[in-house]
Structures are given as C-alpha cells and as structure tokens.
Amino acid sequence: MEVLMMEERIYTIPLRDVINKSVRTKRAPRAIKKIKQFLKRHMKAEIVKIDNELNEKIWERGIQKPPARVRVKAVKEGNVVIATLAE
C-alpha cells in the first residue's frame, strides 16, 4: 500500500508581465495559463487544476483587467496540484 504525501505551499504569483505583454482581449486566459505554468515549474507536477474561487478572482474584473498578482495555495497529491485562493 502506497502512502501519498501531501505537499502544501503558498505562492504569490506575479501576473503583471502577462498584463503588459498581452492584447487586452486575451489577458485573463493568459493569466490562467501563467498560473498553471508557474505551478508546474515550482511544484514539479504534470497536472494543475485551478479551483473555481481562484478562477472567479482572475475573471472578477473581466477579460481585460486581471489582478497584477495573486496569492495561491497549492496542494500536491501525487502528480496533481490543486490551486486555490489563499486567504
């Protein structure tokens, strides 16, 4: 029987470069991709799932104005990372 280790970390992910380098109408989707890419690199996982709360926070002000940075709590179980909004 395998025992799965749960690893939990809190990150502040900067999204300003996505905002500055993207066309206005693609900022929020690119912010989501940036979060997934960041967590894949830092948590060394293949699959990253984003919680509904975090998704709503990114899309809160629409497609053109995602937040400049976001605090994320990442929980890794096996090869899957689940990202939620940190309090």
UniProtKB/Swiss-Prot annotation:
GO terms for cellular component: cytosolic large ribosomal subunit. The keyword ATP-binding does not apply. This is Large ribosomal subunit protein eL31. Belongs to the eukaryotic ribosomal protein eL31 family. The keyword Cell division does not apply. GO terms for biological process: cytoplasmic translation. Pfam families: Ribosomal_L31e. GO terms for molecular function: structural constituent of ribosome. InterPro entries: Ribosomal_eL31, Ribosomal_eL31_CS, Ribosomal_eL31_dom_sf. Signal peptide: none annotated. HAMAP family: Ribosomal_eL31. It comes from Methanocaldococcus jannaschii (strain ATCC 43067 / DSM 2661 / JAL-1 / JCM 10045 / NBRC 100440). Keywords: Ribonucleoprotein, Ribosomal protein.
